[in-house]
């Protein structure tokens, strides 16, 4: 019997990564309000709380029978969280701050089915090139970065801004396959069985 997997996300990047496999899934956007959770100084705990909150909101709103998969990605630099920018100007300020620097990207993945909850996370280090400030506005406009934490995308124009990625590149896109693989095994779902 095919597993019932529910991707609790409106992210086209997460959907695209999951589509690398033949595993059937449906998408439900969580109603969880991310901005309602204050950052308390622990980026892993923060990311996990957001991922679990998304999964729990899907249970509350839809009560599906399948395995709910949610994730949350945060950018951390010098102890500060860079979520999705609220405006064009905020995205530019984020890029200025990260220019020429190394920051961390933490993605927490939560799987929830009935009362069974499994959570894991992945951390990746990303180093930016020194960015020419006069082009940052064009970058934000060209690649619609307001829906991306940190105000940037590795897939769209990433080569212009990223010097180096240490760790899982899928983590930077919002869904670390290695972490997902190990968590799905806890629900008797093996991604190796769903290779295209």
Curated annotation (Swiss-Prot):
Its cofactor is a divalent metal cation. The active site is at residue 72. Its EC number is 3.6.1.9. Disulfide bonds: none annotated. The keyword Hydrolase applies. Its main location: cytoplasm. It holds the Pfam family Maf. It catalyses: dTTP + H2O = dTMP + diphosphate + H(+); UTP + H2O = UMP + diphosphate + H(+). The record marks 13, 73, 155 as: Important for substrate specificity. Keywords: Cytoplasm, Hydrolase, Nucleotide metabolism. GO terms for molecular function: dTTP diphosphatase activity; UTP diphosphatase activity. One of its GO terms (cellular component) is cytoplasm. The keyword Hydrolase applies. It comes from the Bacteria. Belongs to the Maf family. YhdE subfamily. NCBIfam families: maf. This is dTTP/UTP pyrophosphatase. It comes from Chlamydia felis (strain Fe/C-56) (Chlamydophila felis). The lineage of its organism: Bacteria, Pseudomonadati, Chlamydiota, Chlamydiia, Chlamydiales.
